[in-house]
Amino acid sequence: MTVFAALYTDEDMSALVATLLRSRGLDITTVPEQATLGKTDREQLEFATAQGRCLLTHNRVDFERLHLQYMEEDRQHYGIIVVPQKNAYEVAQRIGILVSTLMADEINNQLLYA
């Protein structure tokens, strides 16, 4: 059982957030690192799911809709964490607190707000 969720930032998330979380020892990758820039939100969630990663986003509206669609279709994902657009240090702190208090399997199929 994995303690901390593996993370994937969507393209709207600052690269500094990934750097800060990585410095805390978290397993995180980004859209530019995975060459998935320009993919739709659904494709980003599908990619994160295929990689076993929780998706981090500022895009509340679209990912709330996608989460509901996944649940209605009885599809699985590794979690979605929505974070308000703040400075990168605050965003990283919010995410760090959330993922350090929940085990990876507790995040699966959840839509969470940091």
Predicted regions, residues:
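Acidic, metal-binding active-site segment of PIN/NYN-like and related structure-specific nucleases
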Residues: 47-49, 53-66
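Short catalytic-loop micro-motif centered on adjacent basic/acidic residues
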Residues: 30-32, 55, 82
